[in-house]
Amino acid sequence: MAVASRLAVARVAPDGGAAGRRRRRRGRPVVAVPTAAGRGRGRGGAVAASPPTEEAVQMTEPLTKEDLMAYLVSGCKPKENWRIGTEHEKFGFEVDTLRPIKYDQIRDILNGLAERFDWDKIVEENNVIGLKQGKQSISLEPGGQFELSGAPLETLHQTCAEVNSHLYQVKAVGEEMGIGFLGIGFQPKWALSDIPIMPKGRYEIMRNYMPKVGSLGLDMMFRTCTVQVNLDFSSEQDMIRKFRAGLALQPIATAIFANSPFKEGKPNGYLSLRSHIWTDTDNNRSGMLPFVFDDSFGFERYVDYALDVPMYFVYRNKKYIDCTGMSFRDFMVGKLPQAPGELPTLNDWENHLTTIFPEVRLKRYLEMRGADGGPWRRLCALPAFWVGLLYDEESLQSISDMTSDWTNEEREMLRRKVPVTGLKTPFRDGYVRDLAEEILQLSKNGLERRGYKEVSFLREVDAVISSGVTPAERLLNLYETKWQRSVDPVFQELLY
């Protein structure tokens, strides 16, 4: 997604060595990974459907496990090249009725953004399903949630400016159509049957498969919104430290940003229903990945994990082929029943990695995936929180030391209980709020040492932790008092 929108990277050997020479000896062409940044823009033009899933250069030999590892290793970059990629989703709704917007309305918004603000359209089977502009993209989630995948940026000031620019554009086009956008983690008012379905091939496959593997997968697809940050690593060891820190602290971020307390017009019993939903979506591809904390963990272990996550699809001839439940290992040797003789390309691997949904996800960067969607200030605060912790060596070491003796059972307990009790969740001799205070200070210190005057972006986090009141609890209090037990005012309260 966001940080992936970098220049295409040819395969890199796991040891950083002479991959090109070895590849030529094995009789293969050098194949770059095609990404958004590698394509030119034509003013007001259209580009192929996202993701770009078919390679122009045909493989002469099957991919090996080494190649799959090398794809991940190619994300390693020196600290001076680390960037911040922020993604967020939001619900579009009709201002007059509060109903979710349909695809026709979304198409009109996309066309309006393309015409007024010079975005290129992404088209699938004659339907506009997204937009691109430089290294930014706008895409549609299954229920029409609008997602901005931001460009890889150097500072949080740039990140927040990007978010503000996007929200200005969306508001300018949407207001003329009587459409608003809501920053919350779960659809507060409407039932699953009220949510429109987007015309994207991969989502049809997922929609049919989800009920077979969990009870809440369709809710995840159609009624949730998140904000996440994508961050870089310099080496395998740096990736491991950040992955472990991110997983251990993900429930703390879930508590701080908890913002999904309503469902179908009433409180739902959770502070972050969105987070809870992931616990019964598809446990083959989600969760806290305890193996990341094993001494043997590294790129190879993640590849082994990903190879065993059941597939969703293969994309060939501009069509999605349903491969749900099939093995990428079988695909590697040309034995997919739905695509006999077909062998995977690096793009197939790239696509497969996007169908894995743990609390922290590894691609050629790490994605922090634990936070609910929220209003614009929190869209700036979430990346600030993680940048201060993971991009500063001293703070990262402090987090590693703090969490090194946490057990798998403790991490799972936090994952399970935080969506219900948030900052009030007991942990050891205190509460998650106590942990959050300590972690916030480490994040502030990390941002101070970066030297870009970015600490102010943590004000929202500071306010939540110092008060002990999560965003969800604040909404619940409004619901019981000022809103007189109606969720309708939340559409104005959290309007972008």
Swiss-Prot record:
Disulfide bonds, paired cysteine numbers: C160-C380
Any one Gene Ontology cellular component term annotated for this protein: chloroplast
UniProt record, GO biological process: glutathione biosynthetic process
Tagged with keyword Transferase: no
Keyword field: ATP-binding, Chloroplast, Disulfide bond, Glutathione biosynthesis, Ligase, Nucleotide-binding, Plastid, Transit peptide
Subunit structure, as described in the record: Homodimer or monomer when oxidized or reduced, respectively.
Family named by the database record: Belongs to the carboxylate-amine ligase family. Glutamate--cysteine ligase type 2 subfamily.
Protein name: Glutamate--cysteine ligase B, chloroplastic
